[in-house]
Amino acid sequence: MADIAQKIRNTREDFEERIVEIRRTTKVTKGGKNLSFRVLAVVGNRNGKVGVGVGKAREVPDAIRKALSAARRNVFEVPIYNGTIPHEIVGRQDAAKVLLKPAAPGTGIISNGTVRAVVELAGIHNILTKTSGSTNPVVLAQATVNGLKNLLSLEKIAQLRDITPQEVIYGVKKEG
């Protein structure tokens, strides 16, 4: 029980919220058409924590509340080095692929709107992205999240290669 309370307190941090998409959906039944709304929301602290959530309801405010609540529940940490990601990675979800590449300082965020919302709120300032396949914002956001979740920190990369983090950044000097 204490773990749940701690998780709720953690979600009360100063997260910035962004609504990426509000889509009206219609279900046709024997009695007519039932309207509802689907909302895609992103929350992040611009310091390495970000979450994405989807909410569905008959009214827009209820859908927004559900989406923001789902996004706060799905917050995770992103390794960031010098305002960018440590290495190139591809995130996949269903028919969507998102290529995330580190960029030099001053490059900015080169991306489409959905991916931009996720990486901006994660706190990444310089990144190159390329999307292919599905252009559905929900699927693109989930593909971006999958890519960011699979990033390795500099320390983890150094440990796997059996070198120091400085050698990962600046390269290993060749002898001879």
From Swiss-Prot:
Any one Gene Ontology cellular component term annotated for this protein: small ribosomal subunit
GO biological process terms held by the UniProt record: translation
Gene3D superfamilies for the chain: 3.30.160.20, 3.30.230.10
Any Pfam family matching the protein: Ribosomal_S5_C
Domain S5 DRBM residue range list: 15-78
Gene Ontology MF terms in the entry: rRNA binding; structural constituent of ribosome
InterPro entries: Ribosomal_Su5_D2-typ_SF (IPR020568), Ribosomal_uS5 (IPR000851), Ribosomal_uS5_bac-type (IPR005712), Ribosomal_uS5_C (IPR005324), Ribosomal_uS5_N (IPR013810), Ribosomal_uS5_N_CS (IPR018192), Ribsml_uS5_D2-typ_fold_subgr (IPR014721)
Record keywords, A-Z: Ribonucleoprotein, Ribosomal protein, RNA-binding, rRNA-binding
Record carries keyword tRNA processing: no
Family membership noted in the UniProt record: Belongs to the universal ribosomal protein uS5 family.
Domains: entry comment: The N-terminal domain interacts with the head of the 30S subunit; the C-terminal domain interacts with the body and contacts protein S4. The interaction surface between S4 and S5 is involved in control of translational fidelity.
Reported function: With S4 and S12 plays an important role in translational accuracy.
Quaternary structure (record): Part of the 30S ribosomal subunit. Contacts proteins S4 and S8.
Protein name as it appears in the record: Small ribosomal subunit protein uS5
Lineage: Bacteria, Thermotogati, Thermotogota, Thermotogae, Thermotogales
